[in-house]
């Protein structure tokens, strides 16, 4: 029962994260990739724990124990890993009930007919019940409508949120509020009103070509940092909180530096 309830709440959060600008700015990093593979499943937003919290609190109020809740959320997340692939086709009757790679490819597509569809985590029945289901038809074009060109993971998480607040401040008044809580396509009348979703051009992809030495250097650095992160995770129980914070900051700085190198920025 808890598994089904958690999946329903996940659906509600996920749907809201595509229809409320502030939540979308926090979630958008998961959709920025113009490829669709298992690595996309690992492209998780910094702010997800904050945005999911208000949705999951009612489950605690129902008396579900923390252990059961955390285990259920973990299983829900693990299930969603394998559906981020183009290698698995249609799965017949399974697709009537379960979320599958085909259903989730639709969710990541920016084709106009695929925008804001198939928000399910595990059970696609939520989309069927609430009118947000669309079967896979034409080949999806992946990414975001506005596009994202950059390898800096820190900027990918923070820039959309900063841009949204700057836009709200520029519009001011009630339009500022609507900018934050309205859907992504919303525009004030002075800017032409709600904008239709453009038809994407699959030939327009971000295709960077950083110098080979930079790629090799960043790859080696990534392996070393990953090893360091693994050691920290296993040893964190024995580390003072200040040391954990310092190591976390160093790892984040490292991630930002990779992005700067691969984007060939002067700093």
What are these regions (language model features)?
Residues 1-150:
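Membrane-embedded catalytic scaffold of the fatty acid hydroxylase/desaturase
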Residues 12-21, 161-167, 194-195, 218-224, ...:
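Hydrophobic alpha-helical transmembrane segments
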Residues 15-24, 175-200:
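Short, charged cytosolic
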Residues 36-48, 199-218:
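Membrane interfacial helix-start motif at the N-side
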Residues 37, 152, 172-173, 211-212, ...:
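Helix N-terminus capping/helix-initiation residues
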Residues 140-189:
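A membrane-cytosol interface segment of integral membrane proteins
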Residues 208-267:
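Substrate-recognition/cap regions that form aromatic- and gly/pro-loop-enriched pockets
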